[in-house]
Amino acid sequence: TCAGAAAGRCWSRVAVPEFSAYITSKHANLGFMRVMAKELGPRGIRVNAVCPGWVRTEAAMLSLQNMSKRTGRSEGDLLAEIVGARLAHGAQVLPGLLEPDDLAAPYLWLASDGAKDMTGQALMLDRGEVMA
């Protein structure tokens, strides 16, 4: 049995104003993953997605910087809101940002026999940002 995984980001389950193209692409990733799971399942191939929340990467920090410029709010205030330091709508329940290394274990689990009966599913790894 083979296992495949596609990144969907937690925003693949929500609608966020001013991010229409990004949100649309993430919704499409989940749809594609589900279709592939249906098509490849009869061959014993599993296809699942990992949907991470905010991960401390250059791209995420650039996004934060752009949000700051667009809204006139400080990066620190925005980050505090995102990571749940202030319980705002859409904030994470568990504080802090994911680190890139935090993503390895879920992918390894999906590729293991521990996930042999799982296909077409989105594994939310977002510190409670989206509870769907």
Task: Give the role of each language-model region.
Residues 9:
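Residue(s) in the substrate-gating loop at a strand-loop-helix junction
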Residues 14, 95, 106-109, 119-132:
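Short C-terminal tail/terminal secondary-structure segment
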Residues 25, 33:
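Active-site helix of classical SDR
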Residues 30, 52-62, 66, 70-71:
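Short, flexible catalytic-loop segment of classical short-chain dehydrogenase/reductase
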Residues 40-42, 55, 111:
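A short hydrophobic alpha-helix cap/turn motif
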Residues 41, 46, 118-120:
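Short, small/polar-rich loop/turn modules that mediate ligand/substrate recognition or access, typified
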Residues 75, 89-103:
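A conserved structural motif in NAD(P)-dependent oxidoreductases
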